[in-house]
Amino acid sequence: MISPLFFASEGGFGLNLDLFDANIVNLAIVIFGLYKFLPPFIGGILERRRVAIMADLQDSEDRLLKATEALAAAKKDLAAAHQKAEQIREDCKLRAEAIRLDSEKRTVEEMARVKQGATADLNAEASRASAQLRREAARMAIENALSALPGKLNTEAQSKLVSQSIKNLGEA
């Protein structure tokens, strides 16, 4: 086998064929390079990511705040709308009650007017009928008296009775 130090023994640049030693040296170089150069690079990436996440969080918080304010305003508007609807409902009930009472009042007044008119018509008809019956009764009484009297009265008494009967008929 070839000695690992063979190639390096001449001086200058040589190959180290001992894999374990070579890997440790390579790992040390890589770890040193990562330690020296990677933190600023990864730190920059992580910082940009942190800034983006913070901006997203701030945006989310702003949207949450706006949504909460909008929800509160909507609830306030809803409560105001419910209150206005209740007020309108109460106003409608009061107006309907006023209209109903007014209608009842007008109906009662109309019924009273019709009743008064009917009573007045009935009284007028009763008065007319009563006057007609009195006239008819007086006429019949005069006719009966006139037919019975010619044999009982003389001409002068008969003429006086007819004049008085005509006078009574004129007053009635």
Curated annotation (Swiss-Prot):
Per the record, membrane topology reads: Single-pass membrane protein
GO MF term set: proton-transporting ATP synthase activity, rotational mechanism
> What is its quaternary makeup?
F-type ATPases have 2 components, F(1) - the catalytic core - and F(0) - the membrane proton channel. F(1) has five subunits: alpha(3), beta(3), gamma(1), delta(1), epsilon(1). F(0) has four main subunits: a(1), b(1), b'(1) and c(10-14). The alpha and beta chains form an alternating ring which encloses part of the gamma chain. F(1) is attached to F(0) by a central stalk formed by the gamma and epsilon chains, while a peripheral stalk is formed by the delta, b and b' chains.
Q: Which chain regions cross the lipid bilayer?
A: 27-47
For this UniProt record, the keywords arranged alphabetically read as follows: ATP synthesis, CF(0), Hydrogen ion transport, Ion transport, Membrane, Thylakoid, Transmembrane, Transmembrane helix, Transport
PANTHER family (alphabetical): ATP SYNTHASE SUBUNIT B, CHLOROPLASTIC
Name the record gives this protein: ATP synthase subunit b
